[in-house]
Amino acid sequence: MKNAMQLKAIMKKLAKETQISAQLVLQNYMLERFLERVSLSPYRDNYIIKGGFLISSMVGLNSRATMDMDATIKGYPVTQDAVQKMIEQILTVPVDDDITFTFKNIGEIREGDEYTGYRVALTADFPPMAVPLKLDITTGDKITPREIQYDYKLMLEDRHIQVMAYNLATILAEKLETVISRSDQNTRPRDYYDVYILTKLQAENIDFPALGAALMATASKRGSDSILQDYRAIVEAVRNSEIMRRQWDNYRKDFDYASTISFDEVCDAVASTMDTLITNNFFN
């Protein structure tokens, strides 16, 4: 990339093609630039990507975009000092892309009173552009049976980088557990969208016995085993919630790729996936 003007033009073109904002495309590109540094670092086996950034890679930027990167750490201490040291070392890995990264700050992530990990703020610098980025780092996640080596396809080059990642069964299991256990208290419509889009675009890759095992492991870790048994009633309660429908309508307005999908369709995706697991005794 010769200069920022050239990069901006490419980002605008991609934004038009994918129907998402140029800023969001740019953030995804810069997160990818960070990920290449991870792949070349001594921490490549410790840093396991998950969440929206990984889902976006699986289904395409035109079907899912995100503003941050979620990862879980394995085989390395997850304290504030250790995480900061790891990220700062990753940022020094030489890559021929003329982008430099600045570590800004790190802080605990809390959901209520519960500590869930660390949030790291970075800036990706490609003068005169300075793009703010966010990494959410956790540890102790239950990956069933284990993380995989994932070929991440680059946005602007015809090549892949190899990184460690959640497998599809665990991604889907965590999403299913979240939407069912949180019922109509879930404030994140994207969780429903992710179940919908993964079951549509990755249908041929879903291993239902593996998904059942991953869902049982996730539910056991989160203490939601009994709640998941009531999935039919919970999905219907969610389907009939005016608040949840309003949240979904707002999500559809914000993201063009969700604009034609009804709330009933995403609820159906959750229910039918669970039906398949229960009917075949893959989850009990």
Question: Which role fits each region the language model picked out?
Answer:
Residues 1-47, 56-65, 69-284:
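Structured mid-to-C-terminal alpha-helical surface segments
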